[in-house]
Amino acid sequence: MIKTVGCIFADSMEYGPFLSRAKEMGGKESIRRGNESVEITLDENGRSLRVIGVKCGIGKVNAASATAFLIADDGVDFILNAGLSGAVHGLKREDMIAATTYIECDFDLTAIGYAPGVKADGQKYLYEADKDLLDLAMQSKGIIAAKVGTGDIFLADPVKKEFFRNTFGIESFDMETAAIAGVCDKLGVPMLSLRKISDDADGDAYETYREMNERQEACLTDLLFNILKRYLKADSLWK
């Protein structure tokens, strides 16, 4: 049996460790819909997992389009996202999180009577991680389950950070996950986002984020491949 997973990364620094690991394993690079990509296959006990890594670019539109392309063009069975994010509440630098709930914090129809984040016509606006993928991630030591917010801003404003915390109850903030989750939810594709906390989403956020981003650490790639190995061994996910 063969399944396909799409692994989405925003920028070169986040994608780099995954690309290096994939190339060491014989991965083949290509361009998919304008995005850098690499593909490998993992095999175990008669099961094959086709793994497609994509560097989508920073922000919601880039993330959403890459997700839609992977689903439409490659028929992925599930999506994993990995990258850095800012701490909003209860987290600190170097923490590793598996995101449980996703919301677009910058979606704003308050001028026409909606609450912050709420979409018109009853459209869903709060998305949940796939339980099976989340369970696989939480088997890794030290992983923290957290609610994340997303927006097309690099969050470095303490006032806005506090507003997002109080309004949405988020613990972390990034620029892609809720967009990926929204596409996956609409198309019925399981997804999970994995994040490492790089900064405190405050006035010093850029410097601390840049310092961690430039290190190009392999910890998220390690976590991602551990999840994929567990997925291959999980009989209940291959029925």
Model-flagged regions — what are they?
Residues I2-E128:
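Metabolite-binding pocket within alpha/beta catalytic cores that recognizes anionic/polar moieties
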Residues A201-K239:
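His/Asp/Glu-rich mid-to-C-terminal helical/loop segments that flank catalytic regions of hydrolases
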Residues Y102, D152, R195-S198:
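Short, small-residue-rich loop/turn micro-motifs
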